[in-house]
């Protein structure tokens, strides 16, 4: 579902400009200088990097424009449902989770976003770089975008370094001030981006393998401390095993893990837990 009221965003504009700059620098400077765009290796690398850039832009656009997941207006928790053994409660008191700002009950894993001013299903965090929340319906495309972005940054760095190893054939091919500027700006962008996005990718791989959101991780730290204090062992209720966790987020078909598909994600108001004996049909629908 497409978001409503999406306007101009400076961070999104910056991201698109950076993607554009890195693409043109990689193809028309690094690849051309290293292989020449008229050679077979040059054409192959240009085609591969172009495909990578297109996947970055496509997944990024979906993450920006797709609604992260709205709580249904008629949502009401069924405390007597035997197939839903886990009901999240407020941190204080024993009432079911109710959003005072939205004036409705919140499903498990949903949280209110102060920026979006509404509750988001399976909210992970609000990301300024996509001007949107990362939630139930756009989490996978956000993750896939990060995968492609890390790959593109590392690929571009390899092309940058490789193109510097080429000895100029004559004085006309010596690097001028224009090329130096491109190389300096590219290195200034690619090195910190590769590190930052690599750390972000590693973090979300860890979360996916545990079937946690960023919010749930921080809540789990406190829950683990309280459990240990009471002589108990805390287990994240939605952790059903590493591979099962992967398939719940990325899909049952390994070949589609890096594609922006989302037909497998279910409604977002109920989730499989470690206490379930039979998988929820909404979560296993292909």
Swiss-Prot record:
Active site residues per record: 127
Assigned EC number: 2.3.1.225
Reactions catalysed: L-cysteinyl-[protein] + hexadecanoyl-CoA = S-hexadecanoyl-L-cysteinyl-[protein] + CoA
Principal cellular location given in the protein's record: Golgi
Annotated DHHC domain residues: 97-147
Keyword Oxidoreductase: no
Superkingdom of source: Eukaryota
TM stretches of this protein: 11-31, 45-65, 141-161, 182-202
Cross-referenced InterPro entries: Palmitoyltrfase_DHHC (IPR001594), PFA4/ZDH16/20/ERF2-like (IPR039859)
The UniProt record lists the keyword Coiled coil: no
Compartments, as annotated in UniProt: Golgi apparatus membrane
Gene Ontology CC annotations of this record: Golgi membrane
Membrane topology: Multi-pass membrane protein
Pfam family, one: DHHC
GO MF annotations, alphabetized: protein-cysteine S-palmitoyltransferase activity
Broadest EC class assigned to this enzyme: transferase
Key words, A-Z: Acyltransferase, Golgi apparatus, Lipoprotein, Membrane, Palmitate, Transferase, Transmembrane, Transmembrane helix
Annotated domain remarks: The DHHC domain is required for palmitoyltransferase activity.
Function: Palmitoyl acyltransferase.
Family the UniProt entry places it in: Belongs to the DHHC palmitoyltransferase family.
Protein name per the record: Probable protein S-acyltransferase 16
Source organism of the structure: Arabidopsis thaliana (Mouse-ear cress)
């Amino acid at each position: 579902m497409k978001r409503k009221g999406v306007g101009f965003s400076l961070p999104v504009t910056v991201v698109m400009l950076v993607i554009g700059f890195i693409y043109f620098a990689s193809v028309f400077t690094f690849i051309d200088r290293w292989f020449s765009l008229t050679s077979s290796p040059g054409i192959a690398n240009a085609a591969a990097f172009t495909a990578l850039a297109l996947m970055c832009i496509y997944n990024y656009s979906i993450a920006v424009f797709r609604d992260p997941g709205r709580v249904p207006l008629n949502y009401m928790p069924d405390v007597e449902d035997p197939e839903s053994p886990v009901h999240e409660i407020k941190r204080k008191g024993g009432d079911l989770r109710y959003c005072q700002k939205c004036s409705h009950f919140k499903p498990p894993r949903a949280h209110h976003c102060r920026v979006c001013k509404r509750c988001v299903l399976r909210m992970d965090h609000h990301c300024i770089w996509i001007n949107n929340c990362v939630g139930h319906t756009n989490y996978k495309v956000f993750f896939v975008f990060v995968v492609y972005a890390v790959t593109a940054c590392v690929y571009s760095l390899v092309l940058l370094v490789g193109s510097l190893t080429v000895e100029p054939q004559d004085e006309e091919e010596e690097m001028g001030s224009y090329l130096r500027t491109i190389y300096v700006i590219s290195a200034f962008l690619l090195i910190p981006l590769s590190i930052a996005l690599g750390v972000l990718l590693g973090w979300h791989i860890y979360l996916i393998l545990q079937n946690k959101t960023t919010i749930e991780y921080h809540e789990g730290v406190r829950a683990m401390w309280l459990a240990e204090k009471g002589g108990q062992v805390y287990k994240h209720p939605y952790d059903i095993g590493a591979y099962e966790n992967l398939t719940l987020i990325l899909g049952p078909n390994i070949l589609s893990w890096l594609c922006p598909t989302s037909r497998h994600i279910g409604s977002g108001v109920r989730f499989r837990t470690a206490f379930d004996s039979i998988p929820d049909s909404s979560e296993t629908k292909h």
